[in-house]
Every structure is written in structure tokens, then in C-alpha cells.
């Protein structure tokens, strides 16, 4: 996890937790200049520690892209550093013989067409000055899918794609086909046929989704992703069979 939120240094959820308005958060965009970002050192240290792969947050929930997306101006190449930080990360990992992957947020608190007021997580969820009338979620989905296509097309082979995350609130069920998930996964599989995908197009870190049922949805992913816990006895599906999992501890 790394992005604009490294500047206030209060976690990647700082904009939501502190209900920071977009215009106030933009000061971090103006300041962002990671002069000490040296992914080659990260990759070398990871390899020496015995790690097999690395995954970077290409875009977290704040919507800031660490890659040069043609669909937004809110990206690292438009900051003082002018660098495509994702490309540097992937090249560094591959140079050390590591598998490389990218995290990509399904949520986007920067995009005007993502739900604001009443959403479970948006920084403006309690602010009636940000109603959802006039917001076109289909526009957002097209934007989001286009960015995933960029990552799957312009950055070489990806070994892991880590989507994050699905949820429900009183107004919406933000999971599965709400994300046009089958279409998204089919695109990813066509562009990156060997990639493995997590299960968060249908759940968060609190559930296992249809992989657990033995009757998986088309967008179920390849592994489950328990968060903030390492299951002491692994994870079994409803029929008692061991499941593939990766713990997400941040």
C-alpha cells in the first residue's frame, strides 16, 4: 500500500476516515514527489528475504493512479515526480526473477460518477451537499474497465491481479455484476491468460464468496483473501475441501 496517503501518513483510508473533501485532499497531489522511491531496492530485499512475488497498489480507493492512465489526470505522471511508478515497480520485480502483480481498487472516491452521499465508504457519505442525482455509474464502470484494460495491455505479463473490494450499504449492493464483473474477468483472462485473480469482485476480506459454496460464479476468482487474520488451520469450503487463500494483513 502506497500512494498520496503516504504524505499525511495516517493510512490509506485517511480520506474516508477523516471525511476529507476532494479539494482539501488535492494538496497532497500537489506535494507528491517520491524522490526516495527505489523499487529496485524493494525487489532486491524481497528476493533476499525469500519472497516469491510482489504486488503494488496501482490505484487505491482515493482514485490516485501510480500509472500513466490516459483516462484521468489524477496520476503520478502529472505530479512533481513525473514518473510511471507502476512500470518501475514491475520492471524491478521482474529483474530480480520475482512474480509481479497489481492491486486495483474497484472503489474510486475521486471519480464524480462514483456514489457519494449515503455510500458506506465514501468520504462524503454523510454530507448531503454531495447527492447522487446526476451521477452516472455506468460512466464510472466504463472508466474503471478501461483502466484495467490499460494495466493488462501496457505493462507486460501480470502474475496476480488483486481487485478490492465488494460491499453492501442501504442503497446499493456493490458486488458481482454491479461491477460488470463477468465482462471484466473475461477481458482480463483474454489479455492475461495466466494471471491469477482474487475473490473480491464478489466479497470483501470478511467472506469467501461462491468459491466456498462449490458452485462458483463466473467472476469468483482463483483464491480467497481473509483480511487481518492468518487462518491457523487453513480454509475449507462447505464440503471440507482445502481452499487456496492469501492473507491480507495491512
Residues covered by each model-derived region:
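Mature catalytic domains of secreted/periplasmic carbohydrate-active enzymes
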Residues: 1-250
